[in-house]
């Protein structure tokens, strides 16, 4: 389930807290939340607290710079701190990147190299 908040006009949108409540109500281990750090920051911030509160139902996270939605190496969110927080919470789900590259995708992967992620 992907909660996008009120900024995205979509019938299935929901706030993180609403999505977590719905997942708890469904009660199925294969229904998980996608926690998009970009949308969570836009919709109120407090990222570490909100992630920790709903960690048990999060199976996928997404990263992007706020507010530019470019590579996650600029802006309001400190992704080194976010990735440290994911490690401290023993997060074992997926990490996705949904952003608009400033140039070619390959040129913008410098941020990922510091985490041991490379191209080719």
Regions found by a protein language model. Name each.
Residues 4-11:
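Surface-exposed cleft-lining segments at the edges of enzyme active sites
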Residues 13-120:
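Histidine-acidic metal/acid-base catalytic patches
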Residues 1-3, 96:
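Short beta-strand segments at enzyme active-site cores
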